[in-house]
Each structure stands twice: as C-alpha cells, then as structure tokens.
C-alpha cells in the first residue's frame, strides 16, 4: 500500500509543480513568512518522532532515564549552532555533504528497504536539492547562503560546468537506484527529479525548497513513520499526530522566539533564512 501511496503522491506532486510554475505571481515572489510557517508546521513535524528513536536507543544502551537523551539531543543542537557561528567556512563542505546524503537517503528509502546503496550514490542523488537552485537561480541562492554565514563565491559551486556535472551525476544516481525496480518505483524517482528541477527553474529558491521539503520530502517520510506506528493508515495517522505534536510545538516556539530575536538585528528575509536552515541543520 505504501508504494502505491508514494507513486500517487509523486504523480500529484509532479503535476502540481508544473501547474504552480505557470503562475507569474508565484514566480515573482518569495512568500518568506508563508515558507517559514509551512516549514514550521509541515516540515518540522517529520522529525518530531526523534524521541521515539531516543527511547529505542536508551534501551540498547540500558539507560533508564529518558531525560539523558533529551539533554544530549539539546546539547548536540546547541553545539551545531555554536560551531556554525564560529567556524562557518570549515563546516560548509560537511554541511553540504550531510544535507545531500540526508535528502538522497530519505527520499529513496521506499525502494531500498532490504537493499544497501552506497553513501556516495545517495549523496549524489540528494545533491540536486543544493545544485539545482545554484544552477538555475544562482544570485538569489547565494544570498541565502550568505545570510546563514556561508560564502560560496570562491568555491566550485558557482561554476556552471561543475554544477552541470553534479546534476548529471544526480540523474545517473536515480537511474542506478531504479535498476531492477518495477515501473512505479522507476517513475517515482524520475518524477521527483524533474519536479525539483521544475521548481528551481521557475520559482524563488526559498519557495522551491519549501514546496519540496514540506510536500515531498517531509510528506514521504511522515507516511513511512505512520505505517511504522500502525499498519492501519487511519490509526497510524492519528497516532503520528499525537506523538509528533509535542516536539513540533516546542520546536515551533523556539523558531518563533529565534525569529523575533534575530529580526531586531537583521532583515526579515535574512532572519527567516537563518532560523529555517540553521534550525533544520541542528
């Protein structure tokens, strides 16, 4: 059932991307606050079950108090933010690799449940999320990176030839991942690839990322979590909402407080970029 849901979802998402890209109003605006709240409500929730993973982890480590997990979880997040502020350029390559791998891995989990793909393959697959906005909307994308303390101006990531090579490698990775898979799984990978390309050709990079992150990446991961909680979809979705709501609410409060604080020192778009991307990374 989950494979059929993934196919139908990718088909609807692909058609929607083409439809949305046809509106000049959407192409000429960034919708900063709408992006912020969409990621806050829909995007953050797909990672809000980390506490369940934490409970499994402390059982393995034979730790009885869940508070230790939350303490370490918070300290890791704060540590990432601190390192980001102090050593941004040193973290740049690591950030890009981890982000690419994360997107490549989670967006292809539906076809690789019992199959191990290489780290490199999944990293190249997921690199399209970073490569496509830099290739098709470079100036605005560089503004986003600059606002989160990353300077790409002296890197290969501003060279068109290098970006085209990475884009081709991402496409080839999708073909390799789809090898020996059924028609639906092949179609999902290709529709996802061209959906992301379409979004980044026509829309502002922040809006393109928000649509991808909330309505493709987070949606697919949430569906996977729902079926892990309960094989009955209706029961699973209510259980997912119940378990995801507390951490989503807490994260939302932190994001809003951070935005309000940063907005006193920076422009609104810079503040939103910092909260979204540094917040998601941590």
Can you describe what each PLM-predicted range is?
Residues 13-21, 72-81, 103, 190-199:
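Hydrophobic, membrane-inserted alpha-helices
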Residues 140-157, 262-268:
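Membrane-interface helix termini and inter-helical loops of multi-pass transporters
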Residues 78-135, 145-153:
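Membrane-interface helix-loop-helix junctions at boundaries between adjacent transmembrane segments
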Residues 24-32, 82-92, 200-209:
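Transmembrane helix interruption/hinge and helix-loop junction motifs
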Residues 19-33, 263-266:
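Short, hydrophobic transmembrane alpha-helix segments
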Residues 212-229:
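Predominantly late transmembrane helices and immediately cytosolic-facing juxtamembrane segments
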Residues 1-13:
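N-terminal membrane topogenic signal
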Residues 97-101, 106, 121-141, 159-177, ...:
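Alpha-helical transmembrane segments of multi-pass integral membrane proteins
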């Amino acid at each position: 059932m989950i494979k059929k849901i993934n196919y139908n979802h990718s088909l609807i998402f692909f058609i929607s991307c083409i439809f949305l890209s046809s509106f000049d109003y959407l192409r000429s605006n960034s919708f900063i606050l709408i992006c912020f709240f969409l990621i806050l409500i829909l995007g953050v929730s797909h990672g809000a079950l980390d506490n369940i993973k934490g409970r499994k982890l402390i059982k393995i480590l034979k730790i009885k108090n869940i508070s230790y997990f939350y303490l370490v979880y918070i300290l890791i997040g704060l540590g990432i933010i601190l390192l980001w502020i102090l050593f941004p350029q040193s973290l740049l390559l690591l950030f890009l690799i981890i982000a690419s791998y994360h997107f490549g891995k989670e967006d292809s989990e539906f076809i690789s449940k019992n199959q191990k793909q290489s780290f490199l393959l999944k990293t190249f697959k997921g690199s399209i999320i970073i490569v496509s906005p830099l290739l098709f909307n470079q100036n605005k994308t560089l503004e986003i990176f600059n606002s989160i303390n990353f300077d790409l101006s002296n890197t290969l990531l501003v060279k068109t030839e290098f970006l085209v090579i990475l884009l081709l490698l991402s496409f080839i990775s999708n073909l390799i991942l789809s090898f020996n898979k059924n028609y639906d799984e092949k179609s999902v990978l290709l529709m996802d690839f061209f959906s992301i390309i379409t979004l980044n050709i026509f829309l502002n990079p922040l809006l393109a990322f928000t649509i991808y992150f909330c309505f493709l990446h987070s949606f697919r991961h949430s569906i996977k979590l729902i079926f892990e909680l309960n094989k009955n979809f209706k029961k699973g979705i209510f259980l997912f909402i119940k378990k995801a709501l507390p951490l989503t609410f807490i994260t939302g409060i932190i994001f809003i407080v951070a935005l309000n604080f940063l907005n006193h020192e920076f422009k609104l778009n810079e503040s939103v970029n910092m909260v979204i991307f540094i917040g998601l990374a941590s």
